[in-house]
């Protein structure tokens, strides 16, 4: 009798574990590597140089005492010509304890993919990291962006494009609203859902927190103009830059 109950108990535990695995995977809570860019214009630093020492200091600092509460930090170290500027931004649902693992991964990933580059950017699902020898605070980066899209198409492309664009525009307005605050700080992030026919679209937009609200709206407005190029009729898509990004999918991909 006890063996029967033991088997039932084990099967129940397995079922719960499978359910949890399915729940996590259905939310697509991954931290996959997406893309990187190594700057050719800023040159490379030499081993043991002042620039390398400044960079190492900043990177070790942000991974240990970074501002993970709001998932953002912009910091600098050194003096010209060895100034180092570093920025990280975690996704809007990946602050606090969820932010540091992504930043640590990004630091090691950037060192590996862009060794000794003075300027470089790397994107993961849940964060981005940028190093530079040039200051960029409150400046929109119009050059470094890219897009990813689902190869599958919607049957009613025209309706889907119209309604998804409307959702993203609504979220862009919300994210860049000067009254959208967390305490006294601009949120610069918004997420939402919309039913289109039989499908439910989940979407988000976000700006880096060095931007003021007007610059955030300007940045989002710019990348939303790339929707036809990126996402025409696609079941999922995103445009990512270093200053702002958007994403939509036919499945939930954000934490509550």
From Swiss-Prot:
Pfam families: Stress-antifung. Disulfide bonds: none annotated. Residues 1-26 form the signal peptide. It comes from the Eukaryota. CDD domains: Gnk2-like. InterPro entries: CRR_secretory_protein, GNK2, GNK2_sf. One of its GO terms (cellular component) is extracellular region. It is found in: Secreted. Residues 33-136, 142-253 form the Gnk2-homologous domain. Keywords: Repeat, Secreted, Signal. Transmembrane segments: none annotated. The keyword ATP-binding does not apply. Belongs to the cysteine-rich repeat secretory protein family. This is Cysteine-rich repeat secretory protein 29. It comes from Arabidopsis thaliana (Mouse-ear cress). The gene is CRRSP29.
């Amino acid at each position: 009798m006890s063996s029967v109950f033991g088997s039932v108990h084990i099967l129940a535990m397995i079922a719960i574990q499978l359910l949890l695995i399915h729940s996590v995977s259905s939310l697509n809570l991954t931290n996959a590597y997406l893309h990187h860019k190594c700057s050719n214009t800023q040159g490379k630093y030499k081993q043991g140089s002042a620039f390398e020492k400044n960079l190492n200091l900043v990177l070790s600092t942000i991974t240990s005492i970074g501002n993970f509460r709001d998932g953002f930090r912009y910091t600098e170290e050194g003096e010209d010509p060895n100034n180092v500027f570093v920025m990280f931004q975690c996704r809007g649902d990946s602050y606090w304890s969820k932010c540091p693992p992504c930043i640590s991964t990004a630091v090691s990933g950037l060192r590996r993919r862009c060794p000794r580059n003075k300027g470089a950017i790397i994107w993961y699902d849940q964060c981005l990291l940028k190093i530079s020898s040039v200051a960029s605070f409150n400046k929109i980066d119009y050059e470094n962006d890219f897009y990813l899209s689902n190869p599958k198409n919607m049957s009613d492309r025209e309706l889907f494009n119209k309604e998804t664009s409307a959702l993203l525009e609504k979220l862009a307005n919300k994210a860049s609203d000067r009254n959208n605050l967390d305490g006294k700080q601009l949120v610069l992030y918004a997420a939402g859902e919309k039913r289109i026919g039989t499908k439910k679209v989940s979407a988000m937009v976000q700006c880096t927190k060095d931007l003021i609200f007007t610059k955030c709206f300007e940045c989002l407005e710019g990348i939303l103009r790339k929707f036809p190029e990126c996402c025409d009729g696609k079941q999922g898509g995103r445009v990512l830059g270093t200053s702002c990004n958007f994403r939509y999918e036919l499945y939930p991909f954000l934490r509550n």
